[in-house]
Swiss-Prot record:
Homotetramer. Its EC number is 3.5.2.5. Transmembrane segments: none annotated. PANTHER family: ALLANTOINASE (PTHR43668:SF2). This is Allantoinase. It catalyses: (S)-allantoin + H2O = allantoate + H(+). Its cofactor is Zn(2+). Binds 2 Zn(2+) ions per subunit.
Amino acid sequence: MSEAELVLRSTRVITPEGTRAASVAVTGEKITAVLPYDAPVPAGARLEDVGDHVVLPGLVDTHVHVNDPGRTEWEGFWTATRAAAAGGITTLVDMPLNSIPPTTTVDNLRTKREVAADKAHIDVGFWGGALPDNVKDLRPLHEAGVFGFKAFLSPSGVDEFPHLDQEQLARSLAEIAAFDGLLIVHAEDPHHLAAAPQQGGPKYTHFLASRPRDAEDTAIATLLAQAKRFNARVHVLHLSSSDALPLIAEARADGVRVTVETCPHYLTLTAEEVPDGASEFKCCPPIREAANQDLLWQALADGTIDCVVTDHSPSTADLKTDDFATAWGGIAGLQLSLPAMWTAARGRGLGLEDVVRWMSERTAALVGLDARKGAIAPGHDADFAVLAPDETFTVDPAALQHRNRVTAYAGKTLYGVVKSTWLRGERIVADGAFTDPKGQLLDRA
């Protein structure tokens, strides 16, 4: 074994070549070698033997609403990154809303970076925002290091982040395409939403009818057409409607540069199980029926959907009323995303390698961090999650690190206990004990 400061050893290490018994050598913050399990440990190196627990690359979550500054009663960098670390996530990319100010100018980005600097327990990057009136700010934000730009095609739910109409979408895409940036889009069509029945109240079936599939499908079709027009890179956020999958496949075949994500809640929860009045299950677009979920899983398997991210979007408990029309829409999932996905994947005969591909490898590639994140390979950051995949636990909201311990998974039994999480060669959480914040702020490569 070459010189190393740390050797992390397991009978099951997930590498790009597959799962095998291995000794992972780490020097400083980087992986220097992935060697045979019984390779000799160099003098002076610290051996951490985790037995048959699985060592996987730290997850990369590219869709997180930290809400800091401005709405820290909802979340914040300290609590969000602790929750992420507890769940095996070592990198997150923060959405430009629901913070105040939103990340829509270089000055606002600077404010957010200053707030995050000493609070991040994991590595953190930032998305910019595309608004009707900030086209002039997009290139400066790109040059300042944001990973891309988020836009809404329907109202966002917060006044400081208005949505784009079709003309504004075209202007933003033209500008972003000029420097080959990435536009990530909440795709629901406002006209279809306005035409849908808006009964309100506690019945989930009424809420589901108010966010119909055709609102997603129409908005995605609009986005794909504009992406083709400008040869722009676009990414569909939190896909819920399986009806849009053929549109996406056809666009790709036609050369449109589009990637797609979905979320654990769409893959693990179903409309049929949502109790009336239980707005901890509310998100937009909504959790849909079991048959729709099956098609999302098929799309993950065949590659139509690229990756899985949390869309962690918490609020204070008082905003989660029993009226689905007025309750805040968002699911807090950072700490539970890995066990929730692993539980569902194993139930469908899929492996941890699949989960790693969707939640680490491909998310790192989405934001251009795949040269250093998303894989256990020489030259990559020494980011690891150590998982006991066959151990189970029952979700207790009191055990969550989120600022507001509201969860749609309360009382569920999940497979996969995160035993420890490592960031750039240092163990940052083990058995619920955290180090001081060690996270770095990341720029687009």
